[in-house]
């Protein structure tokens, strides 16, 4: 025999709402993965100089739950402390080989969260991801890239933003 428990709100011992139902099956839960953002290349032409580590500023916001990503600086500065999952991808629009491709996810423009390297390929997407603790006030993250193809090279702009992107979301406190 099955049991039925009916409630329109589930609270913890502190009286904080964990789960709420409107009675019609629509649930409201805590925003546990917020703040979050995801930006990509869409309509941008981004040129990266040869053999130079360059910050990539993506301006097409798909999601920015707390307005924590600044499209003018390329910085994500969440105002909620916690551990964040950070990810990014870079693809160059080039038909020749690279001697060196790099992607770097950085905290406060100093410590590297994650890096990836690739060599001697063209139309290669390089990805990086990792976790980082952010203090909820001054800590920020950015995405950087470096390419060595002998001359400046553009990031691929395939109009749907699936090749070049950067994002993060909170995974815990």
Model-assigned labels for residue ranges:
Residues 9, 19, 67-69:
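Assembly/interface hotspot detector across virion components, adhesins/toxins, and nucleic-acid enzymes
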Residues 4-5, 28-173:
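Extracellular jelly-roll beta-sandwich "head" domains, especially the C-terminal globular C1q domain
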Residues 15-17, 110-111:
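Short acidic/polar mixed-charge low-complexity motifs
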């Amino acid at each position: 025999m099955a049991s039925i428990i009916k409630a329109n709100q589930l609270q913890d011992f502190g009286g904080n709402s964990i789960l709420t139902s409107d009675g019609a099956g629509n649930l409201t839960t805590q925003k546990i993965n917020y703040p979050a953002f995801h930006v990509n290349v869409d309509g941008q032409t981004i040129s990266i100089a040869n053999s130079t580590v360059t910050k990539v500023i993506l301006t097409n916001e798909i999601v920015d739950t707390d307005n924590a990503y600044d499209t003018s600086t390329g910085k994500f500065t969440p105002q909620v402390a916690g551990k964040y999952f950070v990810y990014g991808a870079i693809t160059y629009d080039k038909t020749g080989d690279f001697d060196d491709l790099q992607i770097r996810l950085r905290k406060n423009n100093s410590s590297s969260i994650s890096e990836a390297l690739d060599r001697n390929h063209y139309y290669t997407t390089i990805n990086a991801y990792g976790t980082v603790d952010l203090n909820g006030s001054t800590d920020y993250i950015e995405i950087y890239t470096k390419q060595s193809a002998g001359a400046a090279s553009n990031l691929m702009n395939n109009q749907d933003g699936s090749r070049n992107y950067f994002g993060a979301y909170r995974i815990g406190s």
